[in-house]
Regions:
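Short hydrophobic beta-strand element within catalytic cores of glycosyltransferases
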Residues: 288-291
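Carbohydrate-associated surface elements
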Residues: 149, 170
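Conserved acidic donor-binding segment of nucleotide-sugar-dependent glycosyltransferases
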Residues: 303, 307-314, 323-329
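Conserved donor-binding/catalytic core segment of Leloir-type glycosyltransferases
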Residues: 180-199, 205-208, 221
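A short, histidine- and acid-enriched strand-loop-helix "catalytic/donor-clamping" loop
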Residues: 109-126, 142
Length: 360
């Protein structure tokens, strides 16, 4: 999932800069230790981003894998012209590479962090990991996070830098846009990666059961796939829903937009979130939202565009959905969409990144 967020930032930055991306990943199936799939000459004409993809042969040894990871990045970087700036997404290993490039070649680097591991209740531990992360963050020219709460959480862990900047995730406003529709039964949409520990999808199903027991009409579409997909489906069957819940699996492109934009509102029941990009995509489609009040979500959801509820409280989640089923038509789709265009579009985020680069 992080790869998608990185890709969108790279595409936004490429509106104003020449951007090259280095992508390194293990692969069990390659024959050589390292394999280049795309080279610098292979340029994506649509998104104006040059990409070097290098795969390294996966070993049973963690130490060998770590060595091959760093070696693969070194090989990829050698194929690039000397960069003016290195932009690291997601710590800590890649940050070590950028720090080394700064020490050896004097190349400044900035960090963008998306990861919720710094938020309360998550796992950011280990003396060596924390010390290395502190050093990488300290020596960066800037640190950007997608929400203010993530920046605060990082600093609470002692990750200090004098130049923290909020740079939100990108929403493809040309793809996610309203579709005129008239549902005979109100349609609720949930989109997630089906990882129940963070997304609490079973908690959402519990809340939907409460609505069903009150004889409230609704249909709910679950979009996505993940490690707990089958478990969640089985959980829904166990509770004997009366056919008003539908699982689509993964949807992409226009198929995703068609399902999302023909909804009446979105619901997210997460236990923790860094930002909740699917909520932004819902706003771009003109949908209000019901969401748990966790992580960076209160920075984007308020009474003008949705309803916030405490996490892990099916009763209050059900009450909020019941309220939204009665009031979703009061929200103006264009107003919801315009709030996203102003701050989260490719152009807006790209300009913000360009300003950061120019000021280094």
């Amino acid at each position: 999932m992080f790869g998608l967020f990185v890709q969108r930032h790279a595409e936004a930055a490429a509106l104003y800069n020449n951007i090259s991306v280095v992508y390194v990943h293990p692969d069990d199936n390659i024959h050589d230790k390292y394999e280049f799939v795309n080279d610098i000459s292979c340029r994506d004409a649509i998104h104006r981003v040059s990409t070097i993809r290098i795969y390294y042969k996966k070993s049973k040894s963690k130490i060998i894998n770590l060595y091959r990871f760093f070696r693969a990045n070194k090989l990829a970087i050698k194929r690039l012209p000397k960069p003016d700036i290195i932009h690291v997404h997601v710590l800590t290993r890649l940050g070590l590479i950028a720090w080394w490039q700064k020490i050896v070649h004097g190349t400044p680097y900035i960090i963008t962090e998306h990861w919720s591991r710094y938020l309360p209740g998550n796992d950011f531990s280990g003396f060596l990991r924390k010390w290395l992360t502190k050093m990488v963050v300290k020596n960066a020219s800037a640190v950007t996070t997608v929400t203010d709460i993530l920046a605060q959480a990082m600093q609470n862990h002692g990750l200090q830098n004098n130049n923290y900047i909020i740079v939100p995730n990108v929403v493809n406003i040309n793809m996610f846009k309203p579709i005129e529709h008239h549902n005979s039964i109100p349609k609720i949409v949930h989109v997630s990666c089906f990882e129940n520990k963070s997304k609490n999808i079973t908690g959402l199903i519990d809340a939907l059961c409460i609505l069903e027991n009150k004889n409230i009409d609704y249909q709910c579409v679950f979009i996505g796939d993940g490690i707990d997909f089958e478990m969640v489906k089985d959980y829904s069957k166990k509770l004997k829903h009366q056919g008003n819940i539908r699982f689509t699996g993964v949807l992409e492109g226009q198929d995703l937009v068609d399902e999302l934009a023909t909804g009446d509102f979105m619901v997210l029941s997460s236990n923790y979130e860094t930002q909740g990009v699917v909520l932004l995509e819902a706003f771009a489609c003109g949908l209000p939202v019901v969401s748990t009040n966790v992580g960076g979500i209160p920075e984007i959801v308020n009474e003008s565009n949705g309803i916030l509820v405490p996490p892990q409280d099916p009763e209050k989640l059900a009450d909020a959905m019941q309220t939204m089923l009665q009031t979703y038509q009061n929200y103006n789709a264009n107003t919801l969409r315009n709030s996203i265009i102003k701050k989260f579009s490719n152009e807006s985020v790209g300009k913000l990144l360009n300003d950061i680069y120019k000021n280094l």
